[in-house]
């Protein structure tokens, strides 16, 4: 075999290997289309037109309590919710930073519940926020700030190395949404049809410590600084749990 043919065979082999690697990586990654839909929310922002007057950031209390459809129909306000399950304040900071790379809303609404956590809740929740972000230097910073001791950057760069063990857990959902994903939210709002209005609101449980950590205050100040630099109004809220 000539050197030229050997080179062609080698390049073809490399190409096929890369294609198969990317195929199985996409197959093994969770789809979040039929179960744990919260994991698909972050990625939906980049599919939407970037012309929002209001952007919400925070945990489940924003994507379950605020309706962009209602804001538009009743008040003519365009909005999007960049919420995710158990989103930490440093993840909110980097999601805002990521948002400002693409658009400049007039108002940013941040739900302060996450200030009670000064460390990552779990890798699973990290994944539901970080895997959906587009790759950029901001995502790299977000991953570094969020990783638990057991996690590594390579598993975010190449998720195959994190999810390859799912081969025995694959379901029809993994194949059905391998090449396409449906929208599961309305501008980041996740409709929960099983939620019923509360008839009785119980008293809040007392906490052992009501102080927030320095780390949380630092990121809260970072959010404030980003908004001030861009002339954005920052609204802090605590939505019902």
Language-model features: where?
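Acidic/histidine-rich, surface-exposed loop or edge segments in extracytoplasmic proteins
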Residues: 54-55, 76-81, 199-207, 238
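Alpha-helical transmembrane signal-anchor/signal-peptide segments
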Residues: 28-50
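Membrane-embedded segments
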Residues: 57, 61-146
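Secreted/periplasmic serine-hydrolase-like ester/acetyl group-modifying domain
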Residues: 125-233
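Structural motif
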Residues: 53-54, 107, 233-235
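Hydrophobic membrane-insertion alpha-helices, especially the h-region
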Residues: 5-27
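Alpha-helical scaffolding within the catalytic cores
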Residues: 38-43, 64, 94-97, 217-223
């Amino acid at each position: 075999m000539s050197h030229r043919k050997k080179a062609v065979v080698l390049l073809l082999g490399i190409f096929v290997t890369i294609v198969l690697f990317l195929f199985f990586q996409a197959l093994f990654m969770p789809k979040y289309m039929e179960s744990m839909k919260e994991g698909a929310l972050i990625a939906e922002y980049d599919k939407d037109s970037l012309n929002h007057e209001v952007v919400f950031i925070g945990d489940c209390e924003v994507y379950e309590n605020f309706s962009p459809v209602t804001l538009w129909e009743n008040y003519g306000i365009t909005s999007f919710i960049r919420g995710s399950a158990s989103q930490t304040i440093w993840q909110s900071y980097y999601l805002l930073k990521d948002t400002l790379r693409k658009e400049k809303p007039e108002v940013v609404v941040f739900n302060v519940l996450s200030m009670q956590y000064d460390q990552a809740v779990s890798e699973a929740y990290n994944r539901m926020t970080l895997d959906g972000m587009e790759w950029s230097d901001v995502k790299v910073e977000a991953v570094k700030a969020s990783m638990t001791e057991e996690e590594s950057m390579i598993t975010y760069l190449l998720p195959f190395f994190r999810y390859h063990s799912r081969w025995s857990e694959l379901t029809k959902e993994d194949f059905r949404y391998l090449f396409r994903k449906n929208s599961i939210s309305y501008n980041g709002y996740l409709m929960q049809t099983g939620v019923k209005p509360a008839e009785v609101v119980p008293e809040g449980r007392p906490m052992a410590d009501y102080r927030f950590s320095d780390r949380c205050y630092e990121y809260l100040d970072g959010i404030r600084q980003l908004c001030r630099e861009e002339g954005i109004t920052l609204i802090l809220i605590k939505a019902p749990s």
